[in-house]
């Protein structure tokens, strides 16, 4: 954004010098039968066309990491047994043992688990999409000739709703090895496997919101001739810059992500059983949300209709091939990064504009 402002300031600074140059294209004076400048204001409606892209997730638990289980409920173990393995006899043994331990497996018996699946995964059928939004648009033009102009598209940066799609689950798998004291009971290995629910993005509706700054710059060709044709179609091509700030996450989704942070923290702290039970750890997970800047080509078709030599109506439809990236990080001051999720947001907006302008 700073570079963009610098370019604009520089352009205004050299404009007086250009106006004195002997050139029919760069001048502050009227051209041959046409006005050099125009500005219009009106309604700008943005309709994103992109589809949700799968969210990519990483955690601090690497494949093959071994963690102590700590105290865990027998029912928790039974609910997470690998359904692809025949462990009926083991399940009966666990139930029998739980009868004498009040339903818990204490840390001296639960042993440890070798964990798989949480290092990285793709949450299929999930993603983020930008919602439609309407704002106040401002279009300014400088005409090199009666037919060729340079336009700056701007407006009041709107708050855009980011919609969540799908359900996120963690593909947890592990081999648990019970122990007596410090003696591992390798012959009693327990296969665990389950998709642990993390967040239902559909239930939250709006996952987040952000303020979108999307100035665009175009070279345009206007058909017809000033003073002859009241109705003048035009086409344009240029570049859009997208910058997002004031990002705010849905509190319910943030709570789900903090819970996921506690799960990873529990594993790192030697309480893998508490992770399966979604018990709070001693960590203090916080959630950070970021969105990357992006550039995109933009193309426009539109028209102007002259009321007189100064006032006119304008309408246009533009398309920008715009894609950004959103990063969600869950971290703790002591344990560092616990979970990171990245998602491409295909915005690809169609922009409809209708306004009234003035030439000078």
Regions found by a protein language model. Give the residues of each.
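Gram-negative bacterial Sec-dependent N-terminal signal peptides
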Residues: 1-21
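Outer-membrane beta-barrel biogenesis signature
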Residues: 19-109
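Short loop/turn motifs that connect adjacent beta-strands in outer-membrane beta-barrel proteins
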Residues: 21-36, 147, 224-232, 307-310
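Residues on the lipid-exposed face of transmembrane beta-strands in outer-membrane beta-barrel proteins
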Residues: 41, 138-146, 215-223, 237-241, ...
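Transmembrane beta-strands of outer-membrane beta-barrel pores
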Residues: 43-49, 154-160, 223, 239-245, ...
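Extracellular/periplasm-exposed beta-strand and loop segments of Gram-negative cell-envelope proteins
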Residues: 52-60, 66-75, 96-132, 158-214, ...
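Acidic, polar low-complexity intrinsically disordered regions
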Residues: 141, 149, 153-165
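Compact recognition or signaling/catalytic modules
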Residues: 230, 235-239, 282, 292-294, ...
């Amino acid at each position: 954004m700073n570079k963009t402002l610098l370019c604009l300031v520089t352009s205004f600074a050299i404009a007086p010098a250009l106006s004195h140059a002997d050139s029919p294209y760069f001048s502050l004076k009227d051209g041959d039968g046409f006005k050099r400048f125009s500005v219009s204001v009106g309604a700008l409606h943005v309709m994103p066309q992109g589809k949700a892209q799968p969210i990519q997730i990483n955690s601090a638990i690497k494949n093959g990491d071994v963690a102590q289980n700590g105290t865990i409920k027998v029912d928790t173990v039974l609910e997470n047994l690998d359904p692809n393995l025949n462990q009926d006899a083991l399940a009966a043994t666990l139930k029998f043992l739980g009868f004498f331990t009040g339903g818990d497996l204490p840390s001296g018996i639960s042993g440890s688990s070798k964990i798989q699946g949480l290092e990285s995964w793709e949450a299929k059928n999930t993603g983020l999409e930008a919602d439609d939004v309407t704002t106040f648009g401002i279009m300014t033009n400088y005409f090199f000739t009666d037919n060729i102009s340079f336009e700056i598209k701007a407006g009041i940066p709107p708050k855009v709703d980011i919609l969540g799609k799908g359900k996120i689950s963690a593909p947890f798998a592990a081999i648990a090895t019970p122990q007596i004291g410090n003696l591992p009971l390798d012959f009693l290995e327990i296969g665990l496997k389950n998709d642990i629910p993390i967040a239902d993005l559909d239930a939250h509706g709006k996952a987040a919101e952000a303020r979108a700054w999307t100035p665009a710059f175009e070279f345009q060709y206007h058909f017809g001739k000033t003073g002859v044709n009241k109705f003048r179609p035009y086409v344009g091509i240029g570049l859009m810059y997208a910058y997002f700030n004031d990002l705010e996450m849905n509190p319910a989704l943030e709570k789900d992500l903090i819970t996921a942070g506690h799960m990873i923290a529990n594993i790192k702290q030697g309480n893998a059983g508490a992770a399966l039970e979604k018990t709070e750890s001693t960590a203090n997970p916080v959630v950070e949300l970021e969105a990357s800047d992006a550039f995109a080509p933009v193309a426009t078709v539109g028209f102007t209709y002259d009321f007189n030599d100064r006032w006119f109506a304008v309408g246009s439809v533009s398309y920008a091939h715009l894609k950004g990236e959103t990063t969600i990080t869950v971290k703790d001051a002591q344990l560092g990064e616990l979970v990171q999720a990245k998602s491409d947001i295909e915005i690809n907006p169609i922009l409809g504009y209708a306004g009234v302008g003035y030439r000078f």
